[in-house]
């Protein structure tokens, strides 16, 4: 069991809700009765906008089971917040773009008119149990944030006759590279050879001139400057770093397909040869990678390329390059 640190909010003289952080990759919610209370639950981790707020590894599931598990750890109360309140007798699901640092799990529980938050900081795959005291009957909401730049997925549960004692198990998968799935990336057809690809975590993702700058780069000197290991998540069709960071590519704001920055507009397809092709999600039309003189990896749509007549006008050092693993 990993060593973890806990912070928990609670009130006395009330039933217990147990939140257990475990490991592995699950995507569905299972429902069972908790001391004869009928629980209704919902979960949504779908994309809601730009790169930073789109669903990525890790996913999780919430399981409701009977009774209290022996050997659980009780964490004592420290403080309380009343923000983000959920009304009684309402089931609802929400997704936001809030995120926290890698290797941190945050579970937020709303009951009646109060909000409680548990933060567990430890290894990439925290495994342990925390015990939460719910002060009022009615509904409670569990919210999980895991890793960096991933959405908050919220599950609201309504009991049939008040809040019942029981266990809520939050299963959080390990996320990232393994010897079997990790690789380096390179750019083929770049004017600099070899051209290695890396994500610069210090590069601001910002709007600059006509473009929205990303943090994915090709080396400018033919060396491995800051070279990353990556892996491919076929569920979200993206290349991610080993700590589950999602690189962003530079785009033109006026690009009618991807200029809005929404990740739902495109997918990254990996073929059997390890070549990654960006495509429009609506019709699988190919998008194009380019590299500018600063090493930024750009992406453009065919619609935008046609409008401006020639990518040569954009002062790229290489047009229509190929992203490939090695």
Curated annotation (Swiss-Prot):
Belongs to the mam3/map4 family. It comes from Schizosaccharomyces pombe (strain 972 / ATCC 24843). This is Putative cell agglutination protein pfl9. It holds the Pfam family DIPSY. One of its GO terms (cellular component) is external side of cell wall. May be involved in agglutination during conjugation or other aspects of colony formation. Induces flocculation when overexpressed. Disulfide bonds: none annotated. Induction: Repressed by the srb8 and srb9 transcription factors. Glycans are attached at residue 25.
